[in-house]
Design a protein with these regions (language model features):
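A structural signal for the main folded, soluble domain(s) of proteins
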Residues: 111-113
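Active-site mouth loops of central-metabolism enzymes
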Residues: 34-42, 93-108, 125-128, 133-137, ...
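Catalytic core of soluble alpha/beta enzymes
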Residues: 129-241
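Residue-level signal for beta-strand positions within conserved beta-sheet cores that form or flank
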Residues: 27, 92, 209
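Conserved N-terminal beta1-alpha1 strand-loop-helix module at the mouth
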Residues: 37-94, 106, 117-118
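Conserved beta-strand positions in the central sheet of alpha/beta enzyme cores
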Residues: 59, 120-123, 188, 238-240
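Short, Gly/Pro- and small/polar-rich lid/capping loops
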Residues: 2-42
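Generic structural signal for residues positioned in beta-strands
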Residues: 28-30, 50, 95-97
């Protein structure tokens, strides 16, 4: 229970409920720690605070490295969801891409068949790592075969690859150069870090490889897109919502 003095509720949206005081927030809050099946961003236990408001449950679960000003924005979003609710939908359907995991090329057709007809975009996972870290043996050849199989099956679809920061700059340049004839829509986070992304992007341009570079894991905080742009590290950013 908080020892902070009672604070008056903040005004809510016009016509909506007032936002809660600290005491009201904590009265029905539930702290949880959920074990993760796969370690992600250095953690295998996800901590969260569940808040119960008049519009429903909300979740406050910033990553551990986030500072107070970043956590404040996350908390404000959680309170807004729980006390004011979500806005009404503006559309009934949203197009999504098919995803091909790091499977053998012979299995690609079966994976794509699960999505039915009309596939217009495919994300292909590449740079598979083993349980002990490091690329699995033969991953380069497997990646090339997998991507080429997707292109052969879907000659008119947009094809993008996602390495989840699994390559070194040299490995990324090597594989993306080899895939230049596939006509990739973009390569998502081929290497870790903004500096490495900028290096890969510059080397591909020097070689005449037109594949755009997308930043994903390198963008986690509000100022990161500016750093990516300043370094010339990417052509686009993948935003998780």
């Amino acid at each position: 229970m908080s020892t902070a003095p009672a604070l008056p509720p903040l005004p809510g949206a016009p016509g909506g409920p007032a936002l809660p005081s600290v005491e009201e927030l904590l009265a029905d809050a539930v702290a949880v720690a959920v074990p993760m099946r796969v370690r992600f961003r250095g953690t295998d236990l996800r901590h969260a605070l569940l808040l119960r408001g008049p519009a429903g449950w909300a979740e406050f679960s910033p990553f551990p490295e986030y500072g107070p000003h970043e956590c404040a924005a996350w908390l404000a979003a959680a309170i807004e969801a729980g006390w004011q609710g979500w806005p009404g939908p503006v559309r009934q359907t949203v197009p999504v891409n098919a995803t091909v995991p790091a499977v053998a090329a012979d299995d690609v057709e079966a994976v794509l068949a699960r999505y039915g007809d009309g596939i217009t975009a495919v994300k292909v996972k590449v740079a598979e790592h083993g349980p002990e870290g490091g690329l699995v043996p033969g991953s380069r050849e497997a990646d090339l075969a997998r991507v080429r199989r997707v292109r052969a099956l879907l000659p008119h679809a947009q094809v993008r690859v996602d390495a989840n920061a699994g390559w070194t700059p040299a490995e990324a340049v090597d594989v993306l150069t080899a895939l230049a004839d596939v006509g990739l829509e973009y390569a998502e986070q081929p290497v870790p870090g903004i500096t490495d992304l900028a290096e890969v992007r510059a080397e591909l341009r020097a070689r005449g490889v037109p594949t755009p570079i997308a930043a994903d894991e390198a963008v986690r905080k509000a100022e990161d897109p500016l750093a990516v742009a300043a370094a010339g590290a990417a052509d686009l950013i993948v935003v998780k919502v």
